[in-house]
Amino acid sequence: MKINPTYNTKEAAIALYNSPLMDLMYQAATIHREYHNPNEVQMSTLISIKTGGCPEDCSYCPQSMKYHTDLEVQPLMKVDEVVGLAKNAKASGSSRVCMGAAWRNVRDNRDFDKVVEMVQEINGMGMEVCATLGMLDAAQAERLKNAGLYAYNHNLDSSQEFYKDIISTRQYQERIDTIKNAREAGISVCSGGIIGMGETAEDRIGMLMTYVHMEQPPESIPINALVAVEGTPLQDQNPVLVWDMVRMIATSRIMFPESIIRLSAGRTEMSDEAQALCFFAGASSIFAGDKLLTTPNPEYNADVALFKTLGLTAKSPFQDGVQPETKYDEKVEKAKQARADRAAKVANAQPKSADFEPRKVSVK
């Protein structure tokens, strides 16, 4: 995975984010078409394999045991139950399954043994297997990799500066360390954040800049709109504006042209037209199913209808290989030249002021 060298400073990235929306969307759509099939969107399924009872205090999360959200705590699911849900997901068009457990960190116990078995079973189905289990060390990452784990999700959530306003039980550096452990084990990295928590545009870009400064940016970058859940500290936050979501997706697409930009939480508050704008701006994945861990998500039939309307097809998994390598500099220079040629052609077609004579109109 590579980054766009034009926007490898915070100042340049902020200017990009704040550029006229139509220009921003056009640039993002152009880059998206250079690196991805714009009519393919990956359908992923997120399964909450262990729900609630988390000791962390993430202000947005209804699974924290510190908040009263009426969420029923559920133990780790049985292996065959999870495999059955994965089979249903595959039959419905999903090529990726992400298993989420409300843990602060992975522990070397029977529950982890069961998760490893789940990974092995789903990997054997020819699907991309992703997991989000909290912090993990290098040895645990290696074990998951050997079991067939394709990707590990560990979001940064926001910028390092804003992070302390929403979480106190886990340090920002601990998140970066977990990403590093997954990366060094040879696991694909999925990491993104949430907008609408009260952060500024600079905070949103600050999160993306953390990925810019990594040795390799994430293969997947999920962009979530806050789902304000009653009982959490962020319950009174206003819904995210569609335009903010489009800006964040477009900026992410331009800065990380090879990565999969995932349109994640918050789609229930978005119209079909709003989601179409996100796809146009570079989103190339959604989560299918009526829930994202514990929060609502559009029903499967609604997504099928949306795909049909937009002419989208479900993307096959990268299970048998890696995301295709691209030559960024070469492609961008080629695209820049093509745009310059088109602009010159349009300019030459315009009548020169000296040659232009206004048409005379007789008035009776």
Regions inferred by a protein language model and the residue ranges of each:
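Conserved Radical SAM active-site core
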Residues: L16, M65-G192, G196-H213
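Glycine- and other small-residue-rich loops at beta-strand/loop junctions that grip anionic moieties
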Residues: I47, L133, Q171, G193-G196, ...
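Residue-level signature of catalytic and energy-coupling elements of molecular machines
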Residues: P20, C58, H154
